[in-house]
Amino acid sequence: MKTLVSTSAAPSSPLYSQGVTAGPFLFVSGMTGTDVRTGQLAGPTIQAQTAQALRNCLAIVEAGGGRLSDIVQVTVLLSRPEDFAGMNEAYAEFFPTEPPARAVTKLGVELPNVLVSVMLTAYLDRV
Protein backbone atom coordinates (compact mmCIF):
# COMPACT_ATOMS: atom_id res chain seq x y z
CA MET A 1 0.00 0.00 0.00
CA LYS A 2 1.25 3.48 -0.79
CA THR A 3 0.53 6.75 0.96
CA LEU A 4 1.15 10.25 -0.35
CA VAL A 5 3.17 12.60 1.85
CA SER A 6 2.92 16.36 1.50
CA THR A 7 3.90 19.47 3.41
CA SER A 8 3.62 23.20 2.91
CA ALA A 9 7.27 23.45 4.03
CA ALA A 10 8.56 22.26 0.62
CA PRO A 11 7.82 23.17 -3.00
CA SER A 12 4.90 21.33 -4.57
CA SER A 13 3.33 20.80 -7.97
CA PRO A 14 0.15 19.15 -9.22
CA LEU A 15 2.39 17.10 -11.53
CA TYR A 16 4.04 14.97 -8.81
CA SER A 17 3.73 13.92 -5.19
CA GLN A 18 6.30 15.44 -2.87
CA GLY A 19 6.75 12.05 -1.25
CA VAL A 20 5.28 8.58 -1.38
CA THR A 21 5.57 5.87 1.24
CA ALA A 22 5.51 2.24 0.14
CA GLY A 23 5.98 -0.17 3.01
CA PRO A 24 8.72 1.18 5.24
CA PHE A 25 10.23 3.33 2.49
CA LEU A 26 9.59 7.00 1.77
CA PHE A 27 10.52 8.20 -1.70
CA VAL A 28 11.03 11.96 -2.01
CA SER A 29 10.65 13.63 -5.42
CA GLY A 30 13.39 15.81 -6.84
CA MET A 31 13.59 19.08 -4.92
CA THR A 32 15.39 22.20 -6.10
CA GLY A 33 16.79 24.97 -3.95
CA THR A 34 13.54 26.93 -3.97
CA ASP A 35 12.64 28.60 -0.68
CA VAL A 36 8.87 28.16 -0.21
CA ARG A 37 8.68 31.33 1.90
CA THR A 38 9.78 33.49 -1.03
CA GLY A 39 9.08 31.27 -4.03
CA GLN A 40 12.61 32.06 -5.21
CA LEU A 41 15.82 30.08 -5.37
CA ALA A 42 17.74 30.30 -2.09
CA GLY A 43 20.62 32.00 -3.85
CA PRO A 44 22.83 31.99 -6.92
CA THR A 45 25.47 29.63 -5.49
CA ILE A 46 25.55 25.86 -5.58
CA GLN A 47 26.09 25.83 -1.81
CA ALA A 48 22.94 27.86 -1.09
CA GLN A 49 20.81 25.88 -3.53
CA THR A 50 22.09 22.50 -2.31
CA ALA A 51 21.44 23.37 1.33
CA GLN A 52 17.89 24.52 0.52
CA ALA A 53 17.16 21.48 -1.65
CA LEU A 54 18.25 19.23 1.23
CA ARG A 55 16.11 21.21 3.69
CA ASN A 56 13.14 20.81 1.35
CA CYS A 57 13.72 17.05 1.18
CA LEU A 58 14.07 16.81 4.95
CA ALA A 59 10.78 18.68 5.42
CA ILE A 60 9.07 15.96 3.39
CA VAL A 61 10.83 13.19 5.33
CA GLU A 62 9.67 14.79 8.58
CA ALA A 63 6.11 15.16 7.23
CA GLY A 64 6.20 11.42 6.61
CA GLY A 65 7.24 10.72 10.19
CA GLY A 66 10.96 10.35 9.58
CA ARG A 67 14.12 12.20 10.51
CA LEU A 68 17.52 12.95 9.01
CA SER A 69 19.03 9.68 10.25
CA ASP A 70 16.35 7.71 8.33
CA ILE A 71 17.68 8.86 4.94
CA VAL A 72 19.39 5.89 3.29
CA GLN A 73 19.95 7.01 -0.31
CA VAL A 74 20.37 10.37 -2.04
CA THR A 75 20.58 11.20 -5.73
CA VAL A 76 22.00 14.61 -6.60
CA LEU A 77 21.49 16.03 -10.08
CA LEU A 78 23.83 18.88 -11.04
CA SER A 79 23.27 21.34 -13.88
CA ARG A 80 27.01 21.96 -14.16
CA PRO A 81 29.70 19.37 -13.38
CA GLU A 82 32.01 22.14 -12.15
CA ASP A 83 29.68 22.62 -9.16
CA PHE A 84 30.57 19.19 -7.73
CA ALA A 85 32.98 20.52 -5.08
CA GLY A 86 30.62 23.28 -3.94
CA MET A 87 27.74 20.83 -3.72
CA ASN A 88 29.91 18.56 -1.58
CA GLU A 89 30.58 21.44 0.84
CA ALA A 90 26.88 21.94 1.56
CA TYR A 91 26.17 18.21 1.50
CA ALA A 92 28.88 17.48 4.09
CA GLU A 93 27.36 20.05 6.47
CA PHE A 94 24.00 18.31 6.17
CA PHE A 95 25.42 14.80 6.63
CA PRO A 96 28.55 15.30 8.80
CA THR A 97 28.62 11.66 9.99
CA GLU A 98 27.23 8.40 8.64
CA PRO A 99 26.17 9.79 5.26
CA PRO A 100 23.66 7.82 3.23
CA ALA A 101 24.46 6.07 -0.05
CA ARG A 102 24.68 8.64 -2.84
CA ALA A 103 24.80 9.03 -6.60
CA VAL A 104 25.59 12.24 -8.46
CA THR A 105 24.68 12.75 -12.10
CA LYS A 106 23.92 15.52 -14.57
CA LEU A 107 20.52 17.19 -14.51
CA GLY A 108 18.94 16.34 -17.86
CA VAL A 109 16.63 19.33 -18.21
CA GLU A 110 17.51 22.99 -18.29
CA LEU A 111 15.68 24.96 -15.60
CA PRO A 112 16.52 28.69 -15.45
CA ASN A 113 19.12 29.37 -12.72
CA VAL A 114 18.57 25.95 -11.10
CA LEU A 115 21.95 24.43 -10.26
CA VAL A 116 20.87 21.30 -8.38
CA SER A 117 17.99 18.93 -7.73
CA VAL A 118 17.97 16.34 -4.95
CA MET A 119 15.81 13.25 -4.55
CA LEU A 120 16.13 10.69 -1.82
CA THR A 121 14.81 7.60 -0.08
CA ALA A 122 14.27 7.19 3.66
CA TYR A 123 13.70 3.97 5.58
CA LEU A 124 10.97 4.49 8.17
CA ASP A 125 11.34 1.57 10.55
CA ARG A 126 7.92 1.61 12.17
CA VAL A 127 8.05 -1.95 13.46
Where are the regions a protein language model picked out?
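N-terminal presequence-like segments and the immediate start of the first folded domain
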Residues: 1-55, 59-72, 78-127
